[in-house]
Amino acid sequence: MRIAHLGHAELRTPKLEDSVDFFKNVLGLEETERTGHSVYMRAWGDWEHHTLILTEADRPGLEHVGWRVGAPEDVEAFAKEIEARGETVTHVEAGTEKGQGDAIRFTYPGGQMMELYYDVDKFQPGDKRSRLKNAPQKPPYRGLERCS
């Protein structure tokens, strides 16, 4: 039972389009999907469907942090361990969060919501596919034009 890596964060924002513009045009993330009041974005080097979720809300804040676990069975193993510590665990069905399989959510003692998941949709680069096998896509050369 182990955590593989930090997967994503979901931020609440009262200024959804301004936030999307900032993450896209200043920090270089790209939009992967929109659903309801949420926009899914990813950093160019991320292999997963999204790195960041921006969700429209009345107040800004952190909705949750997602951690990918090392194996499918780790999700339930962590659920049992967290419940044994007296914490409440909520099971999240596959597809509730775009690009992600079954997950659990809980509030850790510091007060923020955490999410653990294993199954995730991989980024599909299409025409942005890199020739390098260790890169999910070609680098986004923002502000530069390619010379022929």
Task: Give residue spans per PLM region.
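Core segments of cupin and vicinal oxygen chelate
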Residues: 1-4, 10-48
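N-terminal beta-strand motif that seeds the catalytic metal site of vicinal oxygen chelate
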Residues: 1-17, 62-67, 126-148
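Conserved short beta-strand elements that form part of the metal-binding/catalytic scaffold
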Residues: 30-63, 113-120
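Short coil/turn segments at secondary-structure boundaries
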Residues: 66-73, 94
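Short amphipathic alpha-helices within nucleic acid-binding modules
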Residues: 73-80
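Vicinal oxygen chelate
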Residues: 80-143
